[in-house]
């Protein structure tokens, strides 16, 4: 029987570790980076809320747009819009009531009929609201997307320019102004996008201001005497790294504050991207596409304009959840195995944190019903795996022994039976569920890793999805419970694909991308157990039928 004082000490150590593990990455930072003004020049304004999307023609109500404009009016002089045809509201009219100026845009794509409708509405709005519309933007990144040839774009610009009194411009990434300088002769303002995160050679936040300065001066030299506006500039608050360009709330605050200071030094005419996180953008751009807002999707400011910034303001709740889950896991284990002591307490602490981390990295990013279902299934699977691991560890530490390991063939057979609604496959499930569920996570990891290899640009590294499986590998290693031998083609295929894809991803990603390097290491850790079973073949009983 373990000494109570040892168990209590282990629980206290686990609690202390939990608090430190959640506080350290969320400690106040960037307090020394000052914001030199409390009001921006302009911000991109898309008033879509969760569940709304221009891709599905689900628009906000006029009342919601009014509320959003009233909110941003406290922080900005102007707003930029991207389409002239939206819902049953006119942004320029509402903006005028709140004293805001508008950079009014028309969306141009491959549909020529729709393009003419956009241009007609743009012209009508600009002429109807000259007190609000201070410039018009004919198309956004049309050349980048290759939606129209440059001659058609120029024709659209000329069409609008002949019909409105405001300055006319076109907006695109700065490289495309270099590639198509002839467009400059048809606009009143050169509107460039500078997004260091999305550059072909991404830049860490500490290197971005020098880049912004250099690009701006290059555009001045290329188009002497022409006014230049920065139509989009910003930094994402979450998502996958690109080399050392790391999305985070702290980095976003640092970028915005330093850019505002630079803009005052150099006299930039600029527009920040963007007012609100746009959940619908994840469909095309992943998590990072939905995370450029200065406000969250539920209209909360992400960071103060001055003073320290906390990466995740909700961290105390997740730390508390980790402690509760750890106590629940240990309590349930102690009830079933009265001899459970300090080692089970430490394992429960690790699993509680893993589950809380999985929730933190999953629930806030469940942007639609499909992601919500995926997150729910994953969290349920990780919760079950954590409970089964506690049971297995307690049995091993008690000297009672655990069920003999199952191989991938048996696990695959169980999954196949369940997909065919053969519920008898779950008879005596406690004896094999841990191995079978672990193998399901292995297959999922292999599939996701292949997707990361062939289509990585918008995919997150799935640390939260495999938090408990990673703890399970570490725990089984310490318990000397990793099986050797008995593996078959399933282990070779799943483990081999995962390992090879992880190595290939690490090679393709830049070494500065520590997030990618860390995930590749985690993927290799997950791949080790099945590959170990290939070292020495042992006969394994066929799965029950």
Task: For the regions a language model picked out, list residue spans one by one.
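Aromatic-lined carbohydrate-recognition surfaces of secreted/lumenal glycan-active proteins
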Residues: 106, 160-178, 225-232, 268-278
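Active-site clefts of carbohydrate-active enzymes
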Residues: 194-202, 221-252
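Alpha-helical transmembrane segments of integral membrane proteins
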Residues: 340-545
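Substrate-binding surface in catalytic domains of secreted glycosidases
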Residues: 143-163, 182-222, 240
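N-terminal carbohydrate-binding/catalytic regions of secreted carbohydrate-active enzymes
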Residues: 44-106, 110-117
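Substrate-binding cleft of extracellular glycoside hydrolase catalytic domains
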Residues: 55, 91-167
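Aromatic- and acid-rich polysaccharide-binding/catalytic face
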Residues: 98, 104, 134, 172-210, ...
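Substrate-binding cleft of secreted/luminal carbohydrate-active enzymes
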Residues: 243-306
């Amino acid at each position: 029987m373990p000494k109570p004082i040892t168990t209590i000490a282990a629980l206290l150590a686990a609690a202390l570790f939990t608090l430190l593990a959640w506080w350290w990455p969320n400690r106040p930072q960037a307090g020394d980076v000052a914001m030199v003004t409390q009001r921006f020049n302009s911000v991109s304004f898309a008033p879509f809320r969760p569940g709304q999307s221009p891709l599905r023609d689900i628009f906000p109500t006029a009342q919601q747009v009014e509320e959003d404009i009233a909110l941003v009016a406290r922080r900005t002089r102007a707003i930029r819009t991207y389409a002239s045809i939206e819902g049953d509201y006119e942004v320029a009219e509402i903006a005028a009531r709140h004293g805001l100026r508008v950079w009014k845009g028309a969306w141009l794509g491959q549909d020529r009929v729709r393009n003419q409708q956009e241009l007609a509405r743009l012209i009508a709005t600009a002429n109807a609201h000259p007190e609000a519309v201070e410039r018009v933007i004919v198309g956004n990144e049309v050349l980048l997307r290759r939606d129209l040839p440059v001659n058609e774009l120029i024709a659209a610009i000329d069409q609008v320019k002949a019909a409105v009194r405001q300055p006319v411009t076109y907006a695109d990434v700065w490289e495309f102004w270099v590639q198509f300088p002839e467009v400059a002769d048809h606009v009143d303002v050169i509107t460039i996008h500078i997004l260091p995160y999305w550059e072909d050679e991404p830049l860490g936040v500490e290197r971005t201001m020098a880049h912004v300065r250099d690009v701006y001066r290059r555009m001045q030299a290329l188009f002497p005497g022409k006014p230049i506006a920065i139509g989009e500039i910003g930094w994402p608050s979450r998502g996958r790294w690109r080399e050392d360009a790391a999305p985070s709330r702290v980095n976003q605050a640092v970028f915005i504050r330093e850019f505002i200071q630079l803009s005052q030094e150099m006299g930039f005419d600029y527009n920040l991207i963007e007012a609100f996180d746009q959940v619908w953008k994840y469909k095309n751009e992943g998590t990072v596409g939905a995370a450029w807002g200065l406000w969250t999707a539920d209209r909360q400011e992400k960071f103060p304009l001055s003073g320290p910034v906390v990466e995740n303001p909700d961290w105390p709740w997740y730390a508390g959840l980790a402690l509760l889950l750890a106590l629940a896991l240990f309590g349930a284990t102690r009830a079933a195995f009265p001899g459970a002591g300090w080692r089970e307490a430490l394992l429960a602490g690790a699993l509680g944190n893993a589950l809380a981390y999985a929730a933190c990295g999953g629930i806030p990013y469940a942007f639609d019903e499909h992601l919500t279902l995926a997150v729910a299934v994953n969290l349920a699977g990780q919760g079950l795996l954590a409970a089964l691991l506690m049971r297995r560890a307690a049995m091993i530490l008690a000297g009672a022994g655990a069920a003999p390991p199952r191989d991938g063939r048996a696990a695959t057979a169980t999954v196949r039976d369940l997909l065919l609604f053969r519920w008898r496959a779950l008879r005596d499930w406690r004896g094999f569920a841990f191995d079978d569920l672990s193998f399901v996570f292995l297959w999922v990891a292999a599939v996701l890793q292949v997707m990361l290899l062939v289509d990585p640009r918008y995919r997150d590294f799935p640390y939260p999805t495999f938090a408990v499986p990673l703890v399970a590998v570490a725990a089984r290693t310490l318990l000397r419970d990793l099986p050797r031998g008995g593996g078959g083609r399933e282990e070779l295929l799943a483990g081999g694909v995962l390992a090879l894809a992880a190595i290939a991803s690490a090679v393709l990603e830049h070494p500065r991308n520590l997030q990618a390097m860390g995930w590749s290491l985690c993927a290799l850790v997950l791949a080790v157990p099945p590959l170990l079973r290939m070292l020495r073949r042992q006969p394994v009983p066929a799965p029950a039928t």
